[in-house]
Amino acid sequence: MIELLLLSFVQGVAEFLPISSSSHLILISTYFNFENQSLSLDVSLHIGSFIAVIVYFYKDLINFYENKTLFLKILLSSIPVIVTGYILIKTGQIDKIRNLETIAWTTLIFGILLYISDKFKLQKSIKEDFSFKSTIFIGILQILSLFPGVSRSGIAITAARFLD
């Protein structure tokens, strides 16, 4: 019970920051030697975060849905990661990347990318009028968020900063 409370707390905090909540769940579970930490538990915790967002932002989401073009672009950008995630789960490959070495490398690599975007002052604003080409680009790069250590929001923000 304590491990579920701790993992829920970590998920609740990490999900809303541009850091990988999945990597933090793995790190906490490894550090405390939790035996039941699995992909199924991670998915359950992510679903809990998703439901919390829907409840909290219900009115905003209804207004957001009225902007059909932006809504469509966000849905479109989610398709690559959903399809790839499904394939990785069905083939069992997802379990091979859920480890501390992957977390270390992805954190290092994407930290460097973020540093580069900061160093070169890549300050792009995410506007409602970004192109469908940009939508696809960001969607494809979100596939990388399937690796623990890569934040989905972090990779989307970093990718957007590199757009023309």
Give a label for each model feature.
Residues 1-164:
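Multi-pass membrane proteins that catalyze or facilitate reactions on polyprenyl-/lipid-phosphate substrates
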